[in-house]
């Protein structure tokens, strides 16, 4: 079981999504994460991992785990902004 915490950067990105179906898929994914089901993910380095959402342009949710129970949503992107988002996620992870 995890508790999901979100950064301001993640909330801002999510609020800016116009694709309602994508928002629904992301919300569903985060509920599953709280149940311990991370699904499709991979490590991207420096303690940061990426959850992949197979919808539209390929959404990515970046997170780090602190302790045994907290998953912190750092930021999100689609496939086209992946490089910038990974860099931002790593910077945010260091500041937490």
Report each predicted region and the residues it spans.
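Enriched for short, Lys/Arg-rich terminal
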Residues: 3-4, 12, 20-23, 27, ...
């Amino acid at each position: 079981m995890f508790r999901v915490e979100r950064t301001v950067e993640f909330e801002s990105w999510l609020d800016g999504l116009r694709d309602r179906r994508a928002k629904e898929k992301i919300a569903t994914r985060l509920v599953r994460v709280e149940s311990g089901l991370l699904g499709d993910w991979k490590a991207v380095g420096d303690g940061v991992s990426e959850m992949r959402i197979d919808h539209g342009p390929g959404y990515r949710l970046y997170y780090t785990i602190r302790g045994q129970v907290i998953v912190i949503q750092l930021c999100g992107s689609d496939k086209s902004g992946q490089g910038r988002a990974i860099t931002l996620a790593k910077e945010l992870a260091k500041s937490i």
